[in-house]
Structures are given as C-alpha cells and as structure tokens.
Amino acid sequence: MMNLEQTIAKTFLQMAEGLESGSFGVKPKIALTGMGSEHGEKNAMEAALMAAKKGVDVYYIGTLEAEGVTTIKVENEDEGHKKMEEMVESGEVDGAVTMHFPFPIGVSTVGKVVTPAKGREMFIATTTGTSSADRIEGMIKNTIYGIITAKASGIADPTVGILNVDGARQTEMALNQLKEGGYQFSWATSARADGGAVLRGNDVLQGTPDVLVCDSLTGNVLIKMLSAYSTGGSFEATGYGYGPGIGKGYHKLIHIISRASGAPLIANALVYAADMVRGKVFEVADKEFAAAEKAGLDKILAARKAAAKPAEAEDEVKAPPAEPCTASIPGIEVMDLEDAAKALWKAGIYAETGMGCTGPLVMMSEANKEKAAEILKKAGYIG
C-alpha cells in the first residue's frame, strides 16, 4: 500500500512540476560545473535555477546551494571537472554543461544561436573541437553532425547551408555526391538574389538555414559574435552556447559554454542538453552515420584525401594568345584558381582569374564558356 501511495504522490508531483514548467515526463539530469566563470559562481547558479524552472533536473557542481537544484560540493574547478566526468561516465547524470572539455579528434560541437535579423534559431556546425585534420573532410563531417543535432532537436528535415569560406565549394560538391548516393537532406537557398547553398554574411544574420556548415574556428567566432554583440563582448547573453560534442561512436553528452557566458545563455545550454536527451541524440547519430556510410561517405572522403595529395610536377603551361574575357565561371576554390586557369590554357583556351562579389572566378570568352565548364567539371574544379 505504501508503494502505491508513493507512486501516486510521485505522479502528482510530476504533474504539478509539469504544469509549472510546461515540461512533462521524467526530467533529464544535467550537471553544470559552476566554478571558473569570468562572471563568478553566482552567475552559474542563477542559470541553474532558471533551467530548473524549464524542466531540467540540474546537478550544480560547485560551492553554492539553492532550493530546486541539487548541489555537488567541490573545493575547486579541477575537482569539479573530475566530478562531472565521473557523473557522466557512471550515468548518474544524462549529460553535462561545462566551460572546457578535451574532445578527441573526430568530435566537435554543434552550437545553437538566435539570429538577430528575424529571431530564428540556427545550428552552427561546428564551433569547437576538430572533426578532421583535413579542412574539407572536416566540413563534410560537420554537415552530418549538424543534421544529427537538428534532428535530435525535433527538426525532421533540417535545411543545410555552407558558409562561403575556403573549402565551401569542394564541400558542396562532396555533399552533392553523398546526396546522389542516397543520403537525404535538404539544401537551404541563400536569401541573396543569386541563391545557392553557399551562404554569405547576410544569411548568417537572417538565419537562412537550419544548419550552417563551416570550420570550427569560424564557427567559434560566429558563436561569440552572435551571443555577445549586444553587450560589448564580455558577456554572452543570447543563444544556447557552443553545443554538444558529436562524432561517430561518441556517446558522452558534453555541452560547451565559455567563461564569458552569462546566466541566460548557460540556462539555455542546460535546456539544449536536456533537449538532446529527450531527442535521443546518440540514437539519431548512429542512424545518420549508417545512412551516410551507405550512401558512400567513406569513398567520398577517400577520394578527397587522394585529391589533396600534391600533384607531380608538370611542364610549365603557357597561356594561349590573349582575347577578351566576357564570360566567367564561379564556384572554384581560391586555392585552386590558378590551377583551374592553367587547365584551360592546356586545352588551348585563354583564361584569366578574378574575384567577384560571390567569390573567385575563372574568366574566358563567351565562345569558350561551355567547353571551359566541361573541362573544369571533369577536372573536379566545379560540380
């Protein structure tokens, strides 16, 4: 009889908490390391209390105590970090939010921001960590990491855009090959007049894609700017932080914030972590990696590595006689621009290089444009 009464009491308590927080069911248990912030430990505890009101069972690791939050007492930051790792490893908590963590190569974090133009939420893949030592391979993997995180957050078919940084066009070509192989995802379209899936700064501000793909250093800068632009930079006030570490076979839920993160952002990071628990992020990850590999991911990455090897020295190619260059072909990586022009010279087509508002261009006569495009596509310079 006592067990029945306890069960009924627990059920009514969960219902009451659900009505108060708007979140029903078992609360995800998320640890927060509170020591080490540039804004003091009170800032972290304030965040813990805010998240607790939103349906997160917060385990605060530090020296402060407050009603509604479970405190795990530690004496210093290092002890707190070790305690957090123990709790995650043992399953005492479902995940953790912390200011630093040594992710292995192949794992990087997917941040989440609120974009200023229209208030849209956008995932940035990625923001810390290293998906690969190779830039293009890393951005290909980052795309999958971003899709995983967005799907675990409840977006069934997230749109993907690539920031116009070095490697964007090669990443786009590789992802189109993956798409042709059967991996399902949807491209975002730039809000700029020329469209396309390679996006510009305007698209970042507007939140054009659900998932913005870039290298992690660029992503880190974007997170900092979008979370702290209204405060002068010392206090990250908006957004959800640098996000969870995602990688193949990696099943520890660790979310990253920074020492400059303010209470509102840390609270959002705790909610973000809870959303990943509810969305079964690691089950989603296993399915997405399996689907990508079935579509030829490993072969695409292997081809990318082979293409990145230094080519054997060739005889110097001389330019054909000059002629007016009235046509142009975009979409070539800036590092490949000169080689692309020489590939056309070798075929007897006079070409010049330039930089348009959308990026690098190879220019030639209108009469040679179609043939030049075929040559560049065959050589792998354009998709």
How would you describe each model-predicted region?
Residues 3-15, 70-93, 129-137, 193-206, ...:
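Glycine-rich oxoanion-binding loops at beta->alpha junctions
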Residues 9, 115-129, 208-298:
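Glycine-rich phosphate/nucleotide-binding loop
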Residues 28-42, 129-140, 256-263:
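Short, glycine-rich nucleotide/cofactor-binding loops
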Residues 78-82, 171-231, 319-323:
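Active-site rim loops that border cofactor/substrate pockets in soluble metabolic enzymes
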Residues 244, 250-383:
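C-terminal non-catalytic interaction/assembly regions of soluble proteins
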